[in-house]
Amino acid sequence: MEKQKLIKLIDVAAGRKKADLVLKNAKIVDVFQAKILTGDIAISDGYIAGIGGSYQGVVECNYTGKYVAPGFIEAHIHIESSYVSPEEFSRVFIPRGTTTILADPHEIVNVAGLKGLDYMVNAAKNAKMDIRYMMPPCVPATNFETSGADLYADDMEDALKTGEVDGLAELMNFPGVINADDKMIDEILMAKKYGARIDGHAPQVVGKDLNAYIAAGPANDHECSTLEEAEERLARGMYLLLREGSVTQDLRKLLPIVNTANSRRCLLSGDDVQAKTAINKGHLDNSIRICIDEGLNPITAIQMATLNPAEYCGLNDRGAIAPGRRADMVVFESLEDFAVEETYILGEKLSQGNEYLGEVNYYPIDSVESSMHVKDFTREKLQLHLNSDKVRAIGVVPGEVLTTEEHVTVKRDGDGNFVYNDQEDVTKIVVVERHHNTGNVNVNLLSGYGIKAGAIAISIGHDSHNIIATGTNDDDIFMAVNELIKQEGGAVVVKDEKVISRMELKIAGLMCNLPAEKMIAQQDALDEAVHEELGVPDNVNPVMTLSFMPLAVIPKLKITDKGLVDVEKNAFVSNELD
């Protein structure tokens, strides 16, 4: 802060000068003491000068009867999962009360390397939201797949040194950490060299393995899906992120762990939240409503989205309505309904109701636009030869990124090739490498997705984001993949060799360069086509569910362009049962 601005802030706080803006007679949510205060909020140059006593301002607004809480801070999220650019993310999520995010851009960095990070950083400069980034440490996430880039510790040093990133993002390669893999250790030491925070990712890791993982440096985990996992992490000093995303929704399951003794070690997080979800249901505001609905003290829930993440992330200039803090604020009428009415960032009102009030400018996307590099993709590569009728299939678990290992009996033709049986929910699942023209195409089996006709192909396949497709017949799968390549990414739905819906994601094949509303219209049409025409059940999110099938750092079975991975064994396995 400049000297003259600091002097002015002090003068306003002391009542010697008028504030730029005063919110009069507000019900102030005191997140330090978990209570409600009544008084004024005086703001100078975007910062809170004082609260309580009667202040005078150049502009004064009557907030009698209105609650004012700190703006929400998201400690771990992937902008790419919203399917919109950073600028659009800011526009869509601000009306939901989100004012600061710590984003992990490992999706686009896995596709485009450091130029992907550069794009995200520059695009964020156009956003009113404070978008901060963590450095992705797992590019690629594992050695079981082909990514668009490979990053090592030396590649990260400049960004860590200059503060372009706030720390090291989730250490997804937990087997590498536990087994002291050189690449993982070098990256951890690079982060520690600059005193940077390290985020965790350790699904189903327990006991001594968890001790080893935490000893390496990760300070939080958002991958807990059971109370036992949550308790074990809290007992070992980790911060617990209670996740409520578009697909993975663990919040209600984990809330019973939260009590007065540990609540300040608990944070609310979205991880992967589509723009459509934010508009229709909300973001952290929705998580707070769930907490309240489940009986948690409303102020405790607000702490978990404000003060707690501020302290965890080392952002001591925000997270509370208090002197010297950023005037990032949300306004609402009821602690029971908790509907955000207004959002302020640095003292500027940026939303009223669901309407965003600021301007939006966009950074050029040309550096991350052409990302589909596929060669030698033929229909013949979609054949799946099996040496047995008894095989493994990846089992979809609706609402989870975890999968199961299903043992199924399938039909084969005279040459031993898989034949789709419309009486069984088992289809081909295909990954086509799209970064280096390797020609890699891998075919395995999928159970539980529920598709009954046609095919869908997408360019979102966590975390290396190769093309992933599933369908009931090779003709439709082949056409869907080829159409996806032509449109430079997104999603394509085909039935009877006709494209019936598509969603275009031209930014690295991950994000749309259109306004969120236009993207959502495409997404809604695509979801409807998949549910109505292809028969996928309503409890399966068509794109996001499929996109996690290649994520070979979350158990159990996952598919990559190189083969079928048993994550628990940290090894490839065959389609056939041993």
Curated annotation (Swiss-Prot):
Annotated Pfam families: Adenine_deam_C, Amidohydro_1
Taxonomic superkingdom: Bacteria
E.C. numbers: 3.5.4.2
GO biological process: adenine catabolic process
Catalysed conversion reaction: adenine + H2O + H(+) = hypoxanthine + NH4(+)
HAMAP family hit by this protein: Adenine_deamin (MF_01518)
The protein's name in its UniProt record: Adenine deaminase
